Amino acid sequence: MPKTILRLPGVKAESGLSRSTIYLRINQGLWTKPISLGGRTVGWPAHEIAALNAARIAGKTDVEVQSLVRKLEMERKQVAV
């Protein structure tokens, strides 16, 4: 299964959130941290954005979303092995 990486404009389009809100949520633990694509370029795995959107649509609490964020970021490390 191919892993698509979304740059910030794609993440904004998929989530409906502004840049400042995305980075605020990262600081609150409610959004996954971006991955480095080299230089100053960052992106997010598309499946993570889909999972975060699904959690919000399902009405998950902030605590549940924070747990999901930790799980998604841990999965990144397992995929790399």
Task: Walk through the language-model features, giving the residues of each.
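Polyanion-binding surface elements
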Residues: 1-28, 51-58
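Short, solvent-exposed alpha-helical "recognition" segments
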Residues: 28-35
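Residue-level signal for alpha-helical context at structural boundaries
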Residues: 29, 40, 67-71
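Short Lys/Arg-enriched helix C-cap and helix-to-coil transition segments
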Residues: 35-41
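A short, Lys/Arg-enriched interface patch at domain edges and termini
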Residues: 50-78
